[in-house]
Amino acid sequence: MGIQQITNMCSHLQNASRARLGLTSLPNTKYNLALALALHRAGFISSITRGGPHPPTPEALMTYEPEPVTSANVATRRLWVGLKYWNEEPVLKELKPISKPSRLVTASLEQLNRVARGFPAGYMKGLQLGECLFVNTDRGVLEVREAVERKVGGLVLCKVK
């Protein structure tokens, strides 16, 4: 997995959330899409749409049909991510990458189980209320509780508050 892409995505989404943006764009890569879908399943972001360099209109977000990706337009394709807010506060407050290009952090099932229950394991602190930890497994990007439920370990990507 492109760890540098994941750290850039974490930084970009955190900055967009702090700037109170409703819609932001990311490069359309399979790693960014996998993490964005996991964040959407966890309820941190409201929508994900593939598109071009210009954002789709808010009314067309639900019925928007993006043009297919070809070798001629692959460099201009973007993921348009809708951010969520609750009582004037961003739902996505902090996105902290755990694995870095200089240090890849992998976790076994036992370590993930400890972290999910709130205890530290290795480089990872235990999860507190309202936090999620995302793990890249052979079954895709999963939240740590899903990974424990499916009994798989993997590369720890980021912690979200």
Curated annotation (Swiss-Prot):
GO molecular function, a single term: structural constituent of ribosome
Function: Component of the mitochondrial ribosome (mitoribosome), a dedicated translation machinery responsible for the synthesis of mitochondrial genome-encoded proteins, including at least some of the essential transmembrane subunits of the mitochondrial respiratory chain. The mitoribosomes are attached to the mitochondrial inner membrane and translation products are cotranslationally integrated into the membrane.
InterPro entries: Ribosomal_uS8 (IPR000630), Ribosomal_uS8_sf (IPR035987)
Keyword Mitochondrion: yes
Protein name per its UniProtKB record: Small ribosomal subunit protein uS8m
Keyword annotations from UniProtKB, A to Z: Mitochondrion, Ribonucleoprotein, Ribosomal protein
Family: Belongs to the universal ribosomal protein uS8 family.
Disulfide bonds: none
Location within or outside the cell: Mitochondrion
GO annotation terms (biological process): translation
A cellular component term, taken from the record's GO annotations: mitochondrion
The keyword NADP appears for this protein: no
Record text on subunit structure and interactions: Component of the mitochondrial small ribosomal subunit (mt-SSU). Mature N.crassa 74S mitochondrial ribosomes consist of a small (37S) and a large (54S) subunit. The 37S small subunit contains a 16S ribosomal RNA (16S mt-rRNA) and 32 different proteins. The 54S large subunit contains a 23S rRNA (23S mt-rRNA) and 42 different proteins.
